Amino acid sequence: MLTDREIISTLEMLENENLDVRTVTLGINLFDCASHDPEIVKNKIFSRITHLAENLVPICDRIGEKYGIPVVNKRIAVSPIAVVGAALSSSQMVDIAKTLNAVAEEVNVDFIGGFSALVQKGIARGDRALIEAIPHALTATERVCASINVASTRAGINMDAVLLMGNTIKQAAKLTADKDGLACAKLCVFANIPQDIPFMAGAYLGIGEADAVINMGVSGPGVVKKAIDRALEANPDLDLGQISELIKKTSYKVTRVGELIGREVADNLKVPFGVVDLSLAPTPNVGDSVGEIFQSLGLRSIGVPGTTAALALLNDAVKKGGAFASSRVGGLSGAFIPVSEDLNISEAARKGYIGLDKLEAITSVCSVGLDMDAIPGDTSAETVAAIIADEMAIGVINNKTTAARLIPVPGKKAGDNAYFGGLLGQSTILPVNNGQDANRFIRHGGLIPAPIQSLTN
């Protein structure tokens, strides 16, 4: 039974601690839109999405107003376009991306994800056409997001796909050089990608999903920080086990709020409710930062020794509390460490507390460790691919999701600033070791085999 104090604390989260529903994402199956004729594909896609999503934004706004809980982003995720458009050329794939952007504008959603391909074991014709289309597609559109899965624990790491993505990222950055490589901010490379991610840029509707489904992403880093601050102010001698328990209880409340909104949106749209993603997602705003939680836990800054252990504690406690609150937990459900999107982490990078090496290390205990990382524009495609390969290896060996969202900023070097705007924020450009050197290891290509599962050390 809820106590008066628990109800009041939840109201305080809404009033003073930046608690919101970060995203309501409507997944839409587009497989029956496939055709050899690109005009048929485009018309079917536009018709299907407008039919299912025309009321998404007004329903989210109405329910958010009803409960006093803002739904910050309304988004759409579609079936992997590499499969839907398997018969199309790369130039036709660009046209499909423009159609997705047009329909996103029509129904007034913030982003539409699913310009995606799954190439962990091999690259089919449609996959290659889509990957080749990505630089021009993301340059020509504002709301389309792309994700490519290049590795899995069962298949290994497709190094041909990894190198291809290194070149793709470099080309996308070049085409948006006047915007500090902005196209790359809408492109994520994955290992073990889940099929029900509500967050961008990784969202797509998996092959095993329904025709339409609502997936939720809750927020709450500011809520967690304030809860820790209050508890330590009352009792500075709390041990880490007690702090973990506190975070768990806070996560429970946040998740219940998210599921309440998600289920009501799904009921109003007459589609099934899918999952709540428990990921702590920051914004560039003060008081809505994952990085600030580390300082509340007693670290000088994210990136100093103790960071990985603190993140492990935080991530695990959030999952435990969320899993108790809902039987429908999914997506990434692991903390994001997006350098440019988190004001505190961006400042830590500027001061030199955190760099690529530490960000890669903490990926072992979270889902997206190399996220929105600006790197020097002269970093070679092979080096970009090598960074991705390192990130994929952590996910494959540890049987977990990992992802990389790297932005080589044209014309800028380590220590300069990159500006992306809005929720994407800004960041100091991180140095890369031997960034311009050739990398023969990456050029070998092929498949790094799937790891043995019985010997896990």
Report residues per predicted region.
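Anaerobic metallocofactor- and corrinoid-dependent redox/one-carbon enzyme cores
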Residues: 1-457
